[in-house]
């Protein structure tokens, strides 16, 4: 019989999987022509996994890694969207953008042995 899992070890493994998923998501976005502006931006009340730009579009990206793409999509709930919106407002307050900039909230879903699925305009900022 195996001993119960160590909570800290489990947390470290989950964190590592999240970092790997974010790196894979960033690679997928860069191959689509996006340029990274920030990774793991944190402000009081929220965090954004990736902030990327392509042309006039600035995308605030939530990355979710789960066993299936469907499970990843379900993982972005209203509370997570609100936290991301607060962080996006904090980032925007610190950066000057052109008047014609297009802002949106995207999602990238990552599942084992699947290419990341990018959903532009996944939810309101």
Curated annotation (Swiss-Prot):
It comes from Methylorubrum populi (strain ATCC BAA-705 / NCIMB 13946 / BJ001). It holds the Pfam family UPF0102. Belongs to the UPF0102 family. Gene3D superfamilies: 3.40.1350.10. GO terms for molecular function: nucleic acid binding. PANTHER family: UPF0102 PROTEIN YRAN. This is UPF0102 protein Mpop_0474.
């Amino acid at each position: 019989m195996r001993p119960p899992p160590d909570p800290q070890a489990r947390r470290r493994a989950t964190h590592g999987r999240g970092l790997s998923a974010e790196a894979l998501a960033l690679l997928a976005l860069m191959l689509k022509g996006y340029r990274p502006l920030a990774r793991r931006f944190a402000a009081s009340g929220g965090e954004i996994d990736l902030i990327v730009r392509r042309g006039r579009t600035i995308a605030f990206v939530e990355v979710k890694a789960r066993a299936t793409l469907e499970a990843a999509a379900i993982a972005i709930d209203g509370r997570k969207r609100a936290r991301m919106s607060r962080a996006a407002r904090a980032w925007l307050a610190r950066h000057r953008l052109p008047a014609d900039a297009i802002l949106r909230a995207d999602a990238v879903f990552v599942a084992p042995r699947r290419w990341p699925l990018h959903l532009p305009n996944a939810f309101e900022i």
